[in-house]
């Protein structure tokens, strides 16, 4: 039983490695039309759920930390703290998790259905490589859209924090915005975008 599990793990790792290698080999023959279709399907259609998730994440985080910072007289750091936390960590991670759930499930269901209905076998019969036709456009679309969506999510999260800090906690809008300029740097956001592309 243990040996069978080990064999199963090795078999899956080998299959995954082979799929990655085949995908890399097929990257030089990208169908741009399919890539744009997948960018719209996987990226643009994910905007509503990313907006809700990051908006409430930024709002709740600001709600939690503002009282503590006000207690210590550090309310002028709220915006900067939110920008750094969202740009470096929370934004890319939350966007990655949301897309893994939504996009991963959608791709799995779509390709699984094609496998069951023998559409993938039909592609092979027509001398069309299923990896190049199905996998590569989705991989390229994700590589392009995830950093864009991560940046969008960071902006939405900071906006959610801005609303809570100014409308609920009574901070001056200029205090929040000046704090962002003072404590955050471009590298905070570029680092987050690099992380999101890896996700």
Feature-to-residue mapping (PLM):
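Short cytoplasmic-facing helical segments at TM-TM junctions of multi-pass membrane proteins
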Residues: 111-136
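Hydrophobic alpha-helical membrane-insertion segments
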Residues: 50, 144-158
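Start (N-cap) of specific transmembrane helices in multi-pass transporter permeases
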Residues: 129-150
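A hydrophobic alpha-helix feature that marks transmembrane segments and, especially
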Residues: 97-115
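Active-site cofactor/substrate anionic-group-binding motifs, chiefly glycine-
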Residues: 38, 42-94, 98
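Cytosolic juxtamembrane amphipathic/interface segments immediately preceding
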Residues: 26-44
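Membrane-interfacial helix-loop-helix connectors in multipass membrane proteins
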Residues: 64-87, 155-197
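Short, small-residue-biased leader/transition segments that mark boundaries at the very start
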Residues: 2-9
């Amino acid at each position: 039983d243990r040996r069978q599990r080990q064999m199963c793990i090795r078999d899956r790792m080998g299959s995954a490695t082979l799929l990655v290698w085949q995908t890399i080999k097929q990257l030089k023959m990208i169908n741009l039309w399919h890539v744009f279709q997948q960018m719209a399907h996987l990226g643009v259609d994910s905007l509503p759920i990313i907006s809700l998730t990051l908006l409430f994440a930024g709002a709740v985080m600001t709600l939690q930390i503002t009282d503590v910072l006000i207690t210590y007289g550090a309310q002028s750091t709220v915006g900067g703290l939110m920008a750094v936390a969202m740009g470096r960590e929370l934004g890319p991670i939350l966007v990655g998790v949301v897309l893994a759930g939504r996009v991963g499930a959608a791709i799995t269901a779509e390709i699984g259905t094609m496998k069951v209905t023998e559409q993938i076998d039909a592609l092979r019969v027509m001398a069309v490589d299923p990896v190049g036709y199905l996998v590569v456009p989705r991989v390229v679309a994700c590589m392009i859209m995830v950093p864009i969506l991560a940046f969008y999510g960071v902006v939405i999260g900071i906006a959610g924090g801005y609303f809570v800090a100014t409308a609920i906690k009574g901070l001056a809008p200029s205090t929040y915005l000046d704090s962002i300029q003072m404590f955050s740097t471009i590298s905070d956001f570029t680092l987050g975008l690099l992380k999101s592309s890896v996700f």
